Amino acid sequence: MLQDSVGEVTTKYHALSVPLSLECGVSLSGVRIAYERYGRADGKNVILVCHPLTGDAHAAGFHKGDTKPGWWDGIIGPGKALDTNRYCVIAANVLGGCKGSTGPSSEDPATGKPYGTTFPVITIRDMVHAEHQLLEDLGISELYAVIGGSMGGMQAMQWSVEFPSFVRRIICIASAGYTTPMHIAFGAVGRAAIMSDPEWNGGNYPAEKKPNHGLSLARMMAHITYLSDESMRTKFGRRLQKQDAFGYGFDTEFSVESYLQHQGETFVERFDPNSYLYITRAVDYYDLTKNGSLTEGLAATQAKFLIISVSSDWLYPPYLSQEIMLALTTNNREARYAEIVSPHGHDGFLLENAQLNYIVGQFLTPMTVEDLMTNNPPSIQETSSIREAAELMIGHEINHLPVVSGNGTLSGIVTSWDIAKSVAGDFQDLAEIMTKDVITIQRSDSLRLAASLMEKHAISALPVVDDSNHVLGMLTSETLSLSEVLQ
């Protein structure tokens, strides 16, 4: 049940305690990482949220005076998938970003001026190492999970390779195990738009005179890839914007043109052009394959995985997520796959909160037997007659009846089929027909375990017992969809 937001939050800034050794060979000192924290840490409950390409550390809650919550507020907070009553959630702005973490717009301590293009080229691996150092500095020695969508999913997968024993669960959404030629092509066009703007000036521009035109064009082009044909048909169609007929010129006329223009204009107010260059190049370099094999590249991973795709995503189509799944299962890793059904394209991972809350919530905090069992079910003493058992089952409209001993512990189970067979066998005593070697389960056990026990033993009910073998409840196949749980 979804509840409230995490409320008012503030972004914190941390200077890493050691220099970062980057993949390009540079050692970067004085790195600062912006982050937000929601919920209390207990040493084993920390979840790291990795943001997409142009995201930031403000993933949930509200900054003072704001009316718009963080970018993933729909799944972070009390009662949501990333339940802040249960987990401590940390979101950090990536290395190379422009929302508080060290990047090309930060001051170079050697010159007192912004780095610009003298900032070293970074990779997804470098981002993950910066996040790892942040967590170590904060006294966090392990992660319950890392979750991210798009470029955030790349970081999550990189975490599983770089620090396999540090993280227990990986949730990769609408992403891939490597960057495809199409992704590289889109990044190249975006960078060309920025670098061809005269105001870019080789990356040396004042804050008040950025290459906004080029950045706006880059955003417009990229935003097309976040949508889908269906979503654009539904949202815009061929509608004109504020006019009834064609103007026969080159001004903005169609609604979709106006929308993209708005996306570009608002984006330049919150993002740095050089950061866009650096981060898209980091995405270009992302490749978890080893010797051309994703299976080999993921061989050292240890975490449990949840891989999620979006049905209408053509930027990161489902087949890219399925490639990750194939590599993981080939390596005998515990992995689940889910597909969000959405018309929204790549943006579906930011919009389909109901599906995400269910899918992610079940992976992080699976339902247990206690959630579905019938509490305090009827039971019968083992000294009772078959007739008494039959009357009790008919009266309560049940097909499974626990049989208990004098001290209340479980000694057997009788079914409606046992009752029917007793007539043909002319049995009188319950002990003659009941099953004595009963397969049981405990209330804290997972539904997946319950389903597998039912399937393995070809049974349709499980008595739920405590440590003393007293019956607490019953779980039946009528309340547990075997096929859904196993899937």
Curated annotation (Swiss-Prot):
Question: Could you state a single Gene Ontology molecular function term?
Answer: homoserine O-acetyltransferase activity
Q: Which SUPFAM superfamilies match?
A: alpha/beta-Hydrolases (SSF53474), CBS-domain pair (SSF54631)
Q: Does the keyword Chloroplast apply?
A: no
The protein's matches in Pfam families, at most eight in alphabetical order, are given as: Abhydrolase_1 (PF00561), CBS (PF00571)
Please report the stretch or stretches of sequence annotated as the CBS domain: 373-430, 434-487
Catalytically driven reaction(s): L-homoserine + acetyl-CoA = O-acetyl-L-homoserine + CoA
Example GO biological process term?
A: homoserine metabolic process
Q: InterPro entries under this entry?
A: AB_hydrolase_1, AB_hydrolase_fold, CBS_dom, CBS_dom_sf, HAT_MetX-like
Which PROSITE patterns does this UniProt record tie to the protein? Answer: CBS (PS51371)
State its Enzyme Commission number(s). Answer: 2.3.1.31
Q: List the transmembrane segments.
A: none
- Asked if Ubl conjugation is a keyword of the record, the answer is no
Domain (AB hydrolase-1): give its ranges: 45-352
Q: What class of enzyme is it?
A: transferase
Tell me the compartments it is located in: Cytoplasm
Question: GO CC: one term?
Answer: cytoplasm
The entry marks the following residues as binding substrate, namely 219, 347
Instruction: Give the protein family.
Output: Belongs to the AB hydrolase superfamily. MetX family.
On subunit structure and binding partners, the annotation says:
Homodimer.
Job description of the protein: Transfers an acetyl group from acetyl-CoA to L-homoserine, forming acetyl-L-homoserine.
* Annotated PANTHER family: HOMOSERINE O-ACETYLTRANSFERASE
User: What NCBIfam families does UniProt report for this protein, alphabetically?
Assistant: homoserO_Ac_trn, PRK00175.1
Name of the protein in its database record: Homoserine O-acetyltransferase
Q: Which organism is this protein's natural source?
A: Methanocorpusculum labreanum (strain ATCC 43576 / DSM 4855 / Z)
